[in-house]
Amino acid sequence: MRKKIVVGNWKMNKNVAEGVALASSILENLDGGKMACEVGIAPAYPVLSEVGRVIEGSDICLVAQNCHYEDEGAYTGEVSVRMLDSLGCSYIIVGHSERRQYFGETNRTVNLRLKKALEGGMRVILCIGETLEEREAGVTDAIVTAQVREGLADIEDLGNVVLAYEPVWAIGTGKTATPEQADAVHASIRATISDMYGEADAEDIRIQYGGSVKPSNAVELFGMPNIDGGLIGGASLKADDFVAIVNAAG
């Protein structure tokens, strides 16, 4: 059975003091970080180090929101996998829809980031998902399949890869895919993985759902057969809400 994974993506929220306070509250309310599911939190870059100190020794993973695909060099504003490793990160998110929408990331550059993260010994959360226009045009499966195939190009081992399906139209909007809608896309993603890697890998890979997950809908979403936890945005900024979502997965 796949172990569920819940990751709080803080995005560009919380300074150091606020991040430390939030992480401390999450840790306290999760009984010192002992959970039935896997849990991670992804602060902004400047907050990673201090939050890492808070959760050190617990089972909560430190997660980075992105990485560059080069080891070092003249890439102003970018952060390398080696730097993130030195801060204690164990997961890196790549391909989040906001990175694709606002910063021009493509399936190709997402694939480069994913490769570099895996080469650096990291586990990776690969984000995929369609816009409202694409869903209404009936091309959800085609878009998501292309993102999976191109994002995982030349990747032979999926052991350190988690997928996160995040319908762009449901992120931060209050709209949520119904559990049945989300599970149908997750099933389609598994079919793509089966075609690429075989049935065993398709059964083993974990696929999170992201998009306005909150305590009131988490139990139903996480109860679907193909949904293996969540990539949580806004609700991860309140300790009580995030802990309730974690408990829904446990």
From Swiss-Prot:
* Alphabetized InterPro entries for the sequence: Aldolase_TIM, TIM_sf, TrioseP_Isoase_bac/euk, Triosephosphate_isomerase, Triosephosphate_isomerase_AS
According to its UniProt record, the EC number is 5.3.1.1
Q: Which reaction does it catalyse?
A: D-glyceraldehyde 3-phosphate = dihydroxyacetone phosphate
Task: Identify which residues the record assigns to the active site.
Answer: 96 (electrophile), 166 (proton acceptor)
Q: Which UniProt keywords apply?
A: Cytoplasm, Gluconeogenesis, Glycolysis, Isomerase
| Disulphide linkage map | none
- Binding-site list for substrate: 9-11, 172, 212, 233-234
Which pathway features in its UniProt record? Carbohydrate biosynthesis; gluconeogenesis; Carbohydrate degradation; glycolysis; D-glyceraldehyde 3-phosphate from glycerone phosphate: step 1/1
List the GO cellular component terms.
cytosol
- Which enzyme class, named as a word? isomerase
The listed locations are: Cytoplasm
Among the record's GO biological process terms, what is one?
A: glycerol catabolic process
Q: Which GO terms describe its molecular function?
A: triose-phosphate isomerase activity
The subunit structure is: Homodimer.
Q: What does this protein do?
A: Involved in the gluconeogenesis. Catalyzes stereospecifically the conversion of dihydroxyacetone phosphate (DHAP) to D-glyceraldehyde-3-phosphate (G3P).
Q: Which family does it belong to?
A: Belongs to the triosephosphate isomerase family.
Q: Which HAMAP family match?
A: TIM_B
UniProt-recorded name of the protein: Triosephosphate isomerase
Name the species this protein comes from: Chlorobium phaeobacteroides (strain BS1)
Q: What is the primary gene name for this protein?
A: tpiA
